[in-house]
UniProtKB/Swiss-Prot annotation:
Pfam families: DUF179 (PF02622). Gene3D superfamilies: VC0467-like. This is UPF0301 protein BBta_6966. InterPro entries: AlgH-like. HAMAP family: UPF0301 (MF_00758). SUPFAM superfamilies: VC0467-like.
Length: 216
């Protein structure tokens, strides 16, 4: 994770042209995207993505239901020299069990922490809505390791990005549905259940969707 606090704004500006968070009528900041069977991109099959930024210039989001391989949070802390081997036993439960997810195919070597709004670093934390923030500095990982971090958090490696107009086209082509974000769903422990939970939130029976996809 790059410790440069300015990178958060740089990433946001890169894909949206906006440096700070503002509300934009018609855009989907702070909503969930739920992939449909007609998506056609295996990288996003059955994915649930939290949209951190959306404007006329593009969009960026974090996938919240795809584990990042075999690495766990304590191993990542050791790789970043935040803790040493053997210190894992002294980590708080919140750090020991924190999820490490694949956030998307862009910048997969970088970490993005989605977290509850009870933790905030000036000039480093992006407030997306009243319940969810995004921080990309190493300071939040140190705080979590010490038990001083946010109440709810997940670490994602990489993010999903769309050029200007691309997300709108994919939604129009029925590749995505979207709905209001639910912090309990975003930060829930059962990663494998998030897709079905998101479908039910929209009002879709997951079984019916699976059957329809099988007969497409």
């Amino acid at each position: 994770m790059n410790p440069d606090a300015k990178r958060l704004g740089d990433v946001r500006r890169k894909v949206t042209g906006i440096g700070d968070h503002t509300s934009h009528g018609g855009y989907l900041d702070g909503q969930l995207l739920v992939a449909m069977p007609v998506m056609g991109d295996s990288r996003f099959e059955r994915s649930v993505i939290y949209l951190c930024a959306h404007s006329a210039e593009g969009a960026m989001g974090i996938m919240v239901n795809r584990p990042a391989g075999s690495i766990d949070f304590p191993q990542l802390l050791m790789q970043l020299n935040i803790i040493e081997k053997g210190d894992q036993i002294s980590l708080p439960d919140s750090a020991e069990t924190m999820k490490v997810l694949s956030g998307g195919p862009v910048d997969t070597g970088r970490g993005f922490v989605l977290h509850s709004s009870d933790y905030f670093i000036a000039n480093a934390t992006l407030k997306i809505n009243d319940g969810v923030c995004l921080t990309t500095t190493i300071d939040i990982l140190k705080a979590i390791a010490k038990g001083n971090g946010p109440k709810h958090a997940l670490l994602a490696l990489g993010y999903a990005g769309w050029r200007a107009g691309q997300l709108e086209e994919e939604i129009q082509d029925n590749g995505w549905l979207h709905c209001d974000a639910d912090p309990e769903l975003i930060f829930g422990d059962n990663v494998e259940d998030k897709y079905d939970l998101a479908l039910r939130k929209i009002g879709i029976d997951p079984g019916m969707l699976s059957n329809a996809a099988g007969h497409a």
